[in-house]
């Protein structure tokens, strides 16, 4: 009887040890954070030095899974024109994301859609500094009209 009990306890102990060794002990949040860091889309933002809404927008993008680098640029408007942004479409900063030009405070879900759809355009813009756009407001509210631009001209990309 003692041999059977010892054998049973030995098998149970070995099973528990094996389960411990093969179990992933990372917490779900650390696994998710690690995956998000590996998949973060890099974004470079050129902005007028000291622009507070650009800082808030960069933080907004970071909070939505993008890896953001901000560059102070006294000539970001000239850079915007050189990048193909229409004169009436120049926002408060210029960003390069996934091979696209993004001008202004474009919501992250519209950028994500752009990167998923991969249309044959140069980029998108949210002209001006709408009070309900990310970077100006605590969160996007209401409708924002985002335009696409490229060799075929300018058109509405999104009304969200």
Name these PLM-found stretches.
Residues 24-40:
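Ser/Thr/Pro/Gly-rich low-complexity linker/stalk segments immediately outside membranes or between
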């Amino acid at each position: 009887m003692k041999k059977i009990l010892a054998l049973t306890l030995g098998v149970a102990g070995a099973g528990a040890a094996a389960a411990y060794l093969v179990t992933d002990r990372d917490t779900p949040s650390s696994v998710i954070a690690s995956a998000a860091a590996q998949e973060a889309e890099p974004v470079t933002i050129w902005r007028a030095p000291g622009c507070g809404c650009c800082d808030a927008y960069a933080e907004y993008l970071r909070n939505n899974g993008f890896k953001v680098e901000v560059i102070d640029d006294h000539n970001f408007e000239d850079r915007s024109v050189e990048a193909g942004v229409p004169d009436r479409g120049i926002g408060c900063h210029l960003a390069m994301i996934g091979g696209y030009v993004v001008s202004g405070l474009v919501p992250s879900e519209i950028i994500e859609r752009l990167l998923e759809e991969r249309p044959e355009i140069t980029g998108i813009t949210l002209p001006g500094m709408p009070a309900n756009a990310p970077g100006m407001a605590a969160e996007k509210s209401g409708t924002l009209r985002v335009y696409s631009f490229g060799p075929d001209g300018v058109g509405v990309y999104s009304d969200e």
